[in-house]
Amino acid sequence: MESLLRQLSICNELIAQGPACPVGNIAWLNEFCATFLDFASELKAHLPEIAPRWGAPEGGNNIEVETIFLCLTQVVTCITQLERTINIESKFGHETTPMTRLHFLDRIDWCVRRIYVSLSQLDLHQESGAADNLEDHTFVELMDLALDHLEAFMEGLGNTTSNFLYIEEENDTNDACQLGSIINHIVRHALAFANVALEADKKALSELCETLLSECTTFLEGSAELNPGHRKLEALSLERALYGLETFLNEALLHSIFASLVELENTPINRLRHALQEQESESGLTEKLVSDFDTNMDRIQQIGVLAIAFSQDVKTKTIVRSCLASLESLDACIVPALQSSALHHADILEHHFNDEMLIFRNLIHDIIDSRSLVNNYLDMLAESLHIHIAGKSVPREYLLIVQMGSVLAEHFRLPVNYSALSDDGKRVHKDLILILRECLAAVSLATPVDPKRIVKRLKILYSVLAKLRDVIDKNVHDSVFNLSSRRQITNATRTLLRSCKSKSKRQRSYVKQSQDSVVPDPHNYTSSIANSISNDGDLISFQLTEILRIN
């Protein structure tokens, strides 16, 4: 441990030299990379000793280890951007990018210091054997904890001979927390998402949280005089409230994913940049664009938090966290940068934003189950057609629903999703792309089109998507419909994850299920560095990315 901390101290000293280095001088960054590479290699070799509980069934979710993985990934990301910055400096001069250099140096410095703190905490945890905190658990982990409590309680009802009924606490650390506290944390996660969810979903999420709290209170305050049958009904009601909240939250999550990705297409960062530079003539529009951008960034953060919760792969979790960290860091400075006259500073931050967003989008598409995404869009499309029949639709709603269909096209553009389709599925997918193009052309024309013609195409789109859903359904494993136990029947309704190696006993159908979850290469996360190898700094960045692969 002392050797690791000493190397981190050297890294801090090298980073401190960064702001004062001459124009185009990459030697100091190379030296930092070499030192950091030594640190990462040693950390990888000694991780089992430093964090013996990491990866173990009884304590694999160590927040300090996850923080270290995040910081390692962020350092590599920032090094890549620093290389671009230094190359621009060597071409145009130091005065072009001082803010950019400081931005990435500050992020690296923070990450290195945070790794130092996390390693120190791990050392303390080894000595004290500190237990996990509920604050460190994800929404999915909390759901499993609550359901495990209820499952143990109902099993105990069949064995008890006493009138005094209670929840038996397990020796396991995760089960040592009281059910009421677990439910409160679940509600906290749900309300955090509800704050950024679409308006149509906010009220329902709030009501489901109230129902869950009410059922929890009824269950926890249940009288000892009640018979086991009555207590079991209370437990089942609480379990039903938990599943109801999770199911609706995931439907709302998919709604938010459609809305956020469409918003990114409608308001790309370069359009925001243009609007900010022309703000004198369109100040009202500019304010709205900035407000919408901020709202969408908040929504993307919550989407990412839930994506991390549903993903069971360490690499995927780490890269999603890194994307969120980059986007959060950029959120505070990108609008001022786009408004400033520092063109190179704005160019680099815009490029960085687009890179991180592309990685994030592809990871989200890799995590989400194709069938759930199709079903969710079919529901929205059916509602849109119903609104038209009621005579309440407007042209913008047609455009929006078709743009959401383009999110499906983007989903299947990812090789891992397209390759999962059968031959019939690929034929139907081809039809989907054709009808989507027709629909988009119809709703995008400057000349108004008869709504009946648009609706006719939307109905064809619905029919094609229904066929695609049916084809995907045929590929679903029979295990989803296994009727061997009550728990499996209940879980079949849990609608985002590929079948993956999960610590959870409950499989979520809204997430892809895969044999061995492997982080996709959405933007060729490593090859994008390898392809630009033109100097020592590029080479070391590539080596760092390779060494930081997590087994």
Swiss-Prot record:
Gene3D superfamilies: Vinculin, Vh2 four-helix bundle. Transmembrane segments: none annotated. It is found in: Cytoplasm; Cell membrane. One of its GO terms (molecular function) is beta-catenin binding. One of its GO terms (biological process) is cellularization. Keywords: Cell membrane, Cytoplasm, Developmental protein, Membrane. It is a peripheral membrane protein. It comes from the Eukaryota. GO terms for cellular component: adherens junction; catenin complex; cytoplasm. InterPro entries: Serendipity_A. PANTHER family: ALPHA CATENIN, RE47911P-RELATED. Required for the cellularization of the syncytial blastoderm embryo. Involved in the localization of the actin filaments just prior to and during plasma membrane invagination. Sry-alpha together with nullo and bnk may provide auxiliary functions, by acting both to stabilize a large and dynamic microfilament structure and regulate its functions. This is Serendipity locus protein alpha.
